A protein has these predicted regions:
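Conserved inter-motif catalytic segment of the P-loop NTP-binding fold
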Residues: 39, 47-50, 54-156
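Short flexible coil/turn linkers enriched for glycine and charged/polar residues
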Residues: 38, 81, 196-200
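Phosphate-binding/switch region of NTP-binding enzymes
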Residues: 148-204
Length: 204
């Protein structure tokens, strides 16, 4: 059985593809060590209403503008939490309307992967991982089997296509990330977003 990719001397392997790209949100870039690495999967977890969706929508809009300037693929924002109209309204409020920011409302994994195939994004945002379900797996969205399957499929897409993926994740009442604990070990980075939903400041 021949390997899919031949082994090469390490000095001949370009490290450029593994360099972090700034998100345009300074504090998030600081936490991530300079930005998002192509092919990396980042989980942003926090309580409902803390501002996870707004933060990632801002990141998506800034990334879309940067991708357009670099003649790269668009940014695909998939919402399973809200309607496309609700997300568009929030984008207007934060000045996040950009022609390279594509929006899709999907809750089925196959349809989500079809959107990725059709659009060829340079960044994928999924809000949230607990709202997506695979028709091939028993159980409802957010269950252990579903979250594991959905996360696994999205991680595979990130690695195969070399695109960063940002996932929104909810936390339980005791502060733990909802879904199987394995989710935290599957992704490359886990960011905890905290704060009072009525306050102006948030902690990442």
């Amino acid at each position: 059985m021949s390997p899919a990719v031949e082994a090469r001397p390490i000095g001949e392997v370009s490290a450029e593809e593994a360099r972090a790209r700034p998100t345009g949100v300074g504090e998030l870039d600081r936490v991530l060590g300079g930005g998002i690495i192509p092919g990396a999967v980042v989980l942003l977890a926090g309580e409902p209403g803390v501002g996870k969706s707004t933060l990632l929508l801002d990141v998506a809009a800034k990334a879309a503008a940067a991708a357009r300037r670099r003649s790269e693929g668009p940014v695909l924002y998939v919402t399973g939490e809200e309607s496309a109209s609700q997300v568009s309204l929030r984008a207007e409020r934060i000045g996040g309307i950009d022609p390279a920011l594509l929006l899709a409302a999907e809750t089925e994994l196959g349809a989500l992967l079809g959107q990725v195939e059709a659009t060829g994004p340079s960044l994928l945002v999924v809000d949230s991982v607990q709202t997506i379900a695979s028709a091939q797996i028993e159980g409802s969205a957010g269950g252990v089997a579903q979250v594991r399957a959905v996360a696994g499929a999205l991680i595979a897409v990130a690695k195969e296509r070399g695109i960063p993926v940002l996932l929104v994740g909810h936390v339980t009442k005791d502060g733990g990330i909802a879904g199987p604990r394995v989710l935290e070990h599957l992704v490359d980075v886990v960011c905890q977003f905290e704060g009072d939903r009525h306050a102006r400041l948030r902690l990442l």
